[in-house]
């Protein structure tokens, strides 16, 4: 893993962060089609930067930090804004996004950061890795935001499926957050049992 800063994956991560205020502004001004386009572009860029990093050996120490930060900022910003009144069309009875959905998404991230920070301070452990359920939860959140934006574009659409989407996002956020605690415990046990770490 290199210490380079100006790699294509890192530039894409920086671009994703730069698009967050653009996305937020489009939502506030009711430009839902453009907001969906920007969000879609940001989501695609997330997949592309990961592919480039692996395929062309451009993984970097900085990238392991800014890539998840960019993702968390985009998700957190999205769910906060979508839960605010008068942002999404008021004609849809399922808008705005319920507060408890946004609270679950943000609470999960706060829990993970708090657990990781506490473990690092107490043990010096650095081998944190995302869990499969965390990745699935992120995918669910991305799809959910896309579905919500599509529902906001179609006029007078009931969006009967939105409560199910909200429930799924919340359930995945809670489950993946709790699962991450056990995931980190497993990683720590594996590091302790690694012969290369004996005596360190």
Q: PLM features: residue spans?
A:
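Alpha-helical transmembrane bundles and membrane-interface segments of multipass inner-membrane proteins
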Residues: 1-200
